[in-house]
Regions:
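Extracytoplasmic/peripheral linker and loop segments enriched in polar/acidic and small residues
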Residues: 50-52, 57, 359, 395-396, ...
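Gly/Pro-rich hinge or "lid" segments in bacterial periplasmic/extracellular proteins
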Residues: 101-105, 204-273, 277
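Long beta-strand-rich cores associated with HINT superfamily self-processing modules
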Residues: 557-585
Length: 585
């Protein structure tokens, strides 16, 4: 997803990410670096019906507390693209489609959610028709109408206002490049969406989009009554269709969810409503929060943390069932602005980077977070393993005196001595501060000048994601996870000129020849694409070097001793919150 598709702390640690991948059960597969990727599969069940199958041993009642060191950028469905936001909003927003986790391995299967099926594609591939379930109500008991889905889609084109949201609609939907949403003059009329009756939604495309049913699982497709749209304040009082609804939201601090009395379990093949409430507390100290969860003293037994367990806490794990593991098809990256940093300087940054020491500071586990050498992670179809010299996610970099001298001399030859590297970090986050200190020390040793800008942790995503951010290193996305099981949710949305305009760009690449190559691959059949994406992956790294792949992530999240039903959702790399319950409410 966009600069959210991966939720990474700009500081150091990637916490979670949106992904559609091959899962594993508790204590099972923890990732890897197979030579050929493809653990993800596009499994679907177009005829799935509600209610969702009961979770074994589930009980009702109580409150689950989520102690999160991450501070989400917000919870507007149009503006949501970070995986933690997607996972949390799944509790109270329903979309046209959704992923259900099947069997003991929690395999992700795409199923109808508010739609009756997974949509019908026209013969020319340019129209998708979704029949909508009848009798669905919002939290206040008012009926959901087809026009509410249409309005939500129109709203997603107001990208200057909701700049964090996904942008496939701008590329694929009819008039997507020119329509600017419902708030401008004439914005009520949009040819790309029709509602011929109150239970039918028609989406018209500018070009074929076979992955439309997968995209329809995003929160931006949650219905929204036009009369209830308060724009940037909508996240305070959104209209819920899921099992929970917002009781209160204090941005940057806390989100409280309570039961939605008008949620109809019989229509929902995915979600449950076991606990009475969820209390999300953001901006927590990661070590303190994870230790609280592991110790599980008093109310902390009812708590979880959705970041990977810091390696310093591994000796404190007494019960392996308190760690929820699984694949998360994501790559954490260190981005470099190609419009501000010359290629030869980018190569010297790569040569200087202190990979090994950074991994220690970030508390990474070599088993769950193996070093990366490619853009695509191993689980994604289209991955092929390769390693370019000095770009395998390991090494001392300019901590080595000889390397530091080489880099300094090469900078001088380029006329770039004291080249300024600038980035944001969270001034009130210990790990972020430590990582910045490490990188600053190493880069300055290698002859760079460092300008590190400290900002509050609660606002870090806002700063790193700003289109005009006055920095040249570490802009979001700081990593990426599959929007669905395909490399088409990577290269076209991250490495094209259109990605810069949409706010998703990794490295701000604007290369017409690369745009043309990617477009040509998109026009091929899915099988043919699989052979081409690995070439693009390697070409981007060899020819442009907009990013340093750091590590492939999988999930390793701590839960309190009284938490039941906790599983990793491999489509998010976060918990499947709707299956959680308290063993002793």
């Amino acid at each position: 997803m966009q600069w959210k598709r991966i939720t990474a702390v700009a500081a150091t640690v990637m916490l979670t990410a949106v992904a559609c991948g091959s899962p594993s059960s508790n204590g099972g597969n923890k990732g890897g670096t197979d030579a050929v990727g493809g653990a993800q599969v596009k499994a679907t069940d177009p005829t799935a019906k509600g209610p969702a199958a009961d979770v074994e041993g589930a009980k009702k009642g109580g409150t689950v507390t989520v102690l999160s060191d991450v501070t989400p950028s917000g919870f507007d469905p149009t503006d949501t693209y970070y995986v933690d936001g997607n996972a949390i909003e799944k509790l109270y927003f329903r979309s046209l489609t959704q992923f259900r986790l099947d069997g003991p391995d929690h395999k992700p299967v795409l199923v109808p959610d508010l739609a009756e099926d997974l949509g019908t594609k026209s013969d020319d591939g340019l129209t998708w028709t979704f029949k909508l379930k009848q009798g669905i109500k919002y939290q206040d008991g008012t009926p959901v109408k087809a026009e509410d889905y249409a309005y939500a889609i129109k709203r997603s084109f107001a990208h200057t206002l909701y700049e964090n949201g996904p942008t496939y609609q701008m590329d694929y939907f009819l008039d997507g490049k020119t329509y600017k949403g419902p708030y401008v003059n004439g914005g009520d009329v949009y040819k790309g969406v029709e509602t011929p009756d109150d239970h039918t939604l028609v989406i018209k495309l500018a070009k074929k989009f076979d992955d439309m049913p997968f995209y329809a699982a995003f929160p931006l497709f949650a219905p929204m009554p036009k009369a209830k749209d308060t724009q940037k304040n909508y996240e305070q009082h959104p209209m819920s269709t899921g099992p929970y609804m917002v009781q209160s939201y204090n941005p940057g601090s806390e989100l409280k969810l309570v039961k939605n009395p008008h949620w109809d379990a019989a229509t929902d093949p995915v979600r449950h409503q076991y606990v009475d409430a969820f209390d999300f507390k953001f901006g927590q100290d990661i070590i303190k929060a994870q230790r609280q969860v592991l110790v599980s003293s008093g109310p902390d037994a009812n708590a979880v943390n959705y970041s990977n367990l810091d390696t310093t806490l591994l000796p404190e794990v007494k019960d392996q069932s308190q760690l929820i593991t699984g694949q998360s098809p994501c790559t954490n990256m260190y981005t470099m602005d190609t419009q501000k940093i010359p290629l030869e300087v980018r190569k010297l940054i790569a040569k200087s980077y202190p990979y090994d020491s950074w991994r220690k500071v970030a508390g990474l586990n070599p088993t769950t977070d193996p070093p990366a050498s490619t853009i695509l992670p191993p689980a994604v179809p289209g991955y092929e393993k390769y390693e370019l010299p000095g770009l395998n996610g390991t090494g001392k970099g300019a901590e080595d005196d000889a390397v530091a001298k080489e880099v300094k001399d090469e900078l001088a030859k380029l006329g770039k001595s004291n080249f300024v590297l600038s980035w944001y970090y969270s001034i009130d986050d210990k790990l972020s501060t430590q990582a910045t200190q490490l990188r600053k020390q190493v880069f300055e040793k290698a002859g760079f000048t460092v300008k590190a800008i400290g900002v509050p942790k609660a606002n870090i995503r806002k700063f790193t994601g700003a289109p005009d951010a006055p920095v040249n290193i570490g802009r979001t996305p700081a990593g990426w996870c599959s929007d669905w099981p395909s490399a088409t949710s990577w290269f076209p949305v991250l490495f094209t000129t259109a990605a810069v305009e949409a706010g998703n760009s990794v490295g701000q690449l604007k290369e017409a020849s690369l745009d043309a190559e990617i477009a040509a691959i998109q026009a091929k059949t899915p099988d043919a694409q699989l052979k081409e994406w690995p070439k693009i992956d390697k070409e981007i790294m060899e020819k442009y070097l907009p990013v340093l792949p750091l590590y492939y992530s999988s999930s390793n999240m701590p839960v309190g001793k009284n938490i039941g039903g906790a599983v990793n959702d491999p489509t998010q790399g976060v918990f499947e919150f709707t299956s959680m319950f308290l063993k002793q409410p």
